[in-house]
């Protein structure tokens, strides 16, 4: 647990600025903008017929909790929030599947990754992920872990393009009983 706490301290070293794009820790004044990006993501998933994020979660209380836990991050372009993600050094659901992941105590988990609809298909999502990967590398993180719905073909292709390795199906503990709980797990070795 000490390693995970240390990593959370390391994660707090953001912001990471590149030109007019910045990855930084979110604050409570940004909840409305973050929820707008998440709402865009929910609508996008609904249009694709994907039963993920459709029944309340992630909601405002999730983002508020992420901010309190210092795990909520935003991606800004010229001061405008164009993306959001929850970055953490631990995931209890992932720990239930020790045989699918590479054995390691120093990993970063990405959840609630979303890009504002006006910025999709413009390379922002790819740049966002590259900056998260660069940040992980600079902080000696060994692996990045993420999961997505099996029907989310766009994100699955996105993860493959970013060199994530598809592992296996996992089942998440989700608050609501209406969203599908099965996800495909992915992992990226930071080199």
Give each language-model segment a name.
Residues 42-64:
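Conserved GNAT-fold acetyl-CoA-binding loop/helix
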């Amino acid at each position: 647990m000490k390693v995970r706490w240390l990593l959370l301290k390391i994660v707090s070293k953001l912001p990471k600025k590149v030109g007019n794009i910045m990855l930084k820790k979110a604050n409570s004044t940004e909840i409305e903008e973050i929820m707008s990006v998440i709402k865009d993501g929910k609508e996008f998933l609904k249009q694709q017929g994907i039963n993920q994020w459709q029944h309340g979660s992630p909601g405002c209380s999730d983002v508020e909790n992420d901010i309190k836990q210092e795990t909520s991050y935003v991606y800004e372009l010229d001061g405008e929030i164009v993306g959001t993600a929850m970055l953490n050094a631990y995931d209890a659901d992932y720990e239930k599947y020790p045989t699918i992941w590479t054995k390691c105590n120093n990993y970063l988990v990405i959840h609630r990754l979303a890009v504002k609809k006006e910025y999709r298909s413009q390379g922002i999502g790819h740049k966002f992920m590259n900056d998260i990967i660069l940040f992980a590398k600079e902080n000696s993180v060994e692996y990045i872990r993420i999961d997505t719905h099996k029907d989310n073909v766009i994100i699955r292709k996105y993860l493959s393009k970013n060199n994530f390795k598809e592992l296996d199906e996992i089942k998440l503990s989700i608050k609501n009983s209406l969203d599908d709980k099965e996800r495909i797990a992915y992992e990226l070795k930071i080199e």
